[in-house]
Amino acid sequence: HDEKKLQKIYFKDFGLRNNLCISKDFSHLFENLVLSELFKFKEDFFYNKYFNFYSQISKIAYISSPTLDIDLIKLRAKKILPKALELGIFHVIFITLSSEDSFFEQGVKFEVISFDKFSLRF
């Protein structure tokens, strides 16, 4: 991560996470599931308050948004655009349960894909 105050814990076995945690927050579980798929890349991923995960090598950021609709995703994309440009990220992927779309803002490609298509890409 790139901020000292922001620390997260992820599990390769998220069944273990469910057993250890009292609260069962689906969005956190979904985020952990996305990371499990990203492990297939065998590269380092970072996170900050704008992106769930991003690669400094491939210049791609990933945001797990299981329940946001397309309009809310587009609003969020406009808010994070300056940070994407600052980090040199030119492709941002929002992973959802079922929504799909893609659009460009100032040279940055924003892609909204469902988790099943995301996981089958690898």
Please place each PLM-identified region on the residue numbering.
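Accessory nucleic acid-recognition modules appended to NTPase machines
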Residues: H1-K59
